[in-house]
Amino acid sequence: MKVREITEELEYKLLSPYAAKSRESRGRAREEEKCDIRTDFQRDRDRIIHSKAFRRLSHKTQVFISPEGDHYRTRLTHTLEVAQIARTIARALRLNEDLTEAIALGHDLGHTPFGHSGEEVLNKLLKGGFRHSEQSIRVVEVLENDGKGLNLTWEVKDGILNHSTGGKPSTLEGQVVQISDKIAYINHDIDDAIRGRVLKPEDLPKDLIAILGDKHGKRIDTMVRDVIYNSMGKPEVSMSKEIYEATYQLRAFLFEKVYIGSKAKRDEEKAKRVVEQLFYYFYDNVDKMPKEFVRLAEIYGRERAVADYIAGMTDKYALLKYKEIFLPSPWFEQNIFDL
């Protein structure tokens, strides 16, 4: 018996009846020969980790644009925190950890530079709108691997597509990632806001802190434990009413004090202008994009290809392209022998 087959048999023996089983996957868009060692969900996880889009997450904004300091979250550290929380919950509920981890690692692959600021601009400019969850699917189906995509399983793509608020993942593993995403960003955005002096610990609503905890780690522990004990033996993943209400009131507090009305957002309009002007420039000058995006423009149209190009940019690369295109180069940077 192959190692993969042993692992698949163990899933039936050890996992919850509500867990997704590798052998029962709805499969891939293109059939592939099975791996002797890894299950299909394990292969998906590995493909995501080795993708270029995953590596670029390290230079994409989470909340704070161009923060001064080495300890602020990026889109990559957020992704890793989501994966850690999700695996803890999945293991406790005896769900499929490999599927959970693959969804968690891939859930933000389509995020724009400058966080949700970049997403707002592309959503305004594209006729059909722009959502990072849908772009994440486009990354794994079309943009990665020289246009062939990663050919992920249906279950992983379903979890990625439906991870945002309002989505309805078809697997419990997808539900775990959806709730873990909220737990991660609510807590680490508070941590970053305090580090950036946007908030002080005493600013946090006392009634909510009394329920959830007065420290970063304590709040995460409270939420994770609540999800686990409230979901055991059930065909859905959720928080208890008390913790859910406290968590979402804390989220509303963040929207008011950090995401919308704080000095942390002072550069947001500048970032939006960068994305907008890059979009218009490349829309009018398709030939200035890398050749793979010129090819995409021929297949999917200019608007879609330009959005694909810009959405894949890191903050640093977007600013570099903006500087190259729109800002004059000082003459003293030139070699005098070129004059």
From Swiss-Prot:
InterPro entries recorded: dGTPase, Diverse_Catalytic_Enzymes, dNTPase_2, HD/PDEase_dom, HD_domain, PHydrolase_assoc_dom
Gene3D superfamilies: Hypothetical protein af1432
GO MF assignments: triphosphoric monoester hydrolase activity
Residues of the HD domain: 75-186
Keywords recorded for this protein, A-Z: Hydrolase
Pfam families: HD (PF01966), HD_assoc (PF13286)
Similarity remark: Belongs to the dGTPase family. Type 2 subfamily.
Protein name, UniProt field: Deoxyguanosinetriphosphate triphosphohydrolase-like protein
Annotated source species: Caldanaerobacter subterraneus subsp. tengcongensis (strain DSM 15242 / JCM 11007 / NBRC 100824 / MB4) (Thermoanaerobacter tengcongensis)
